[in-house]
């Protein structure tokens, strides 16, 4: 899981209280998926 800096956080504020837990970072899970999992996701989306 890759974390990168978010651009919606206001400097000088209490991140945990005002902007949600873990504010300041974007977690990108898409890079972790294997090819088989991607294919399965496509099948699930078409079945919905």
Curated annotation (Swiss-Prot):
Record-linked InterPro entries: SASP_SspO
Principal location: other
Superkingdom of the organism of origin: Bacteria
GO biological process per UniProt: asexual sporulation; sporulation resulting in formation of a cellular spore
Gene Ontology cellular-component annotations: endospore-forming forespore
Pfam annotation, one family: SspO
Keywords for this protein: Sporulation
Reported induction: Expressed only in the forespore compartment of sporulating cells. Expression is sigma G-dependent.
Subcellular localization(s) per the UniProt record: Spore core
Residue segments, region Disordered: 1-22
Coiled-coil portions: none
The keyword NADP is assigned to this record: no
UniProt record similarity statement: Belongs to the SspO family.
Name of the protein: Small, acid-soluble spore protein O
């Amino acid at each position: 899981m890759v974390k990168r800096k978010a651009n919606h956080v206001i400097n000088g504020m209490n991140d945990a209280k005002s902007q949600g837990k873990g504010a300041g970072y974007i977690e990108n899970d898409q890079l972790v998926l294997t090819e088989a999992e991607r294919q399965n996701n496509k099948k699930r989306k078409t079945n919905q």
